[in-house]
Amino acid sequence: MARVTVEDAVNKIGNRFDMILVAARRARQIAVQGKEPMVDEMNDKPTVVALREIELGLVTSNTLDADERQTVREREAAEIAAVAAIAEGRVL
């Protein structure tokens, strides 16, 4: 297994602190939310996968923000559809 160098990920993000935040958000997406990794997992833990994705330039703070906004929009649309279905059921 090749070692992930944190320095490569830091260089992609800009500074060590932002890199930690981005890696933690992405690792949480993979581990908890069930998001698919953009690289081969190779039996690595979600944090290592997140660092590899950052290193390859696949994940940035902007891509995570856009993904989060899309998820919120989809969730809100589903809630509105559910409320509309309930309202239609009461009217009938």
From Swiss-Prot:
The superkingdom listed in its UniProt entry is Bacteria
EC numbers listed for it are: 2.7.7.6
For this protein, what reaction is catalysed? Answer: RNA(n) + a ribonucleoside 5'-triphosphate = RNA(n+1) + diphosphate
Q: Which UniProt keywords apply?
A: DNA-directed RNA polymerase, Nucleotidyltransferase, Transcription, Transferase
- UniProt cross-references to Gene3D superfamilies, sorted A to Z: 3.90.940.10
SUPFAM superfamilies assigned: RPB6/omega subunit-like (SSF63562)
Give the UniProt entry's GO cellular component terms: DNA-directed RNA polymerase complex
Q: Pfam families given for it?
A: RNA_pol_Rpb6
InterPro entries with a match to the protein in the record: DNA-dir_RNA_pol_omega, Pol_omega/Rpo6/RPB6, RPB6/omega-like_sf
Q: Which GO terms describe its biological process?
A: DNA-templated transcription
Nucleotidyltransferase is among the record's keywords:
yes
Q: What class of enzyme is it?
A: transferase
What does this chain do? Answer: Promotes RNA polymerase assembly. Latches the N- and C-terminal regions of the beta' subunit thereby facilitating its interaction with the beta and alpha subunits.
The record's NCBIfam families line, in alphabetical order, gives: rpoZ
Family (UniProt):
Belongs to the RNA polymerase subunit omega family.
How does it associate, per the subunit comment?
The RNAP catalytic core consists of 2 alpha, 1 beta, 1 beta' and 1 omega subunit. When a sigma factor is associated with the core the holoenzyme is formed, which can initiate transcription.
**What is this protein's record name?**
DNA-directed RNA polymerase subunit omega
The top of its lineage is: Bacteria, Pseudomonadati, Pseudomonadota, Gammaproteobacteria, Alteromonadales
- Gene for this chain: rpoZ
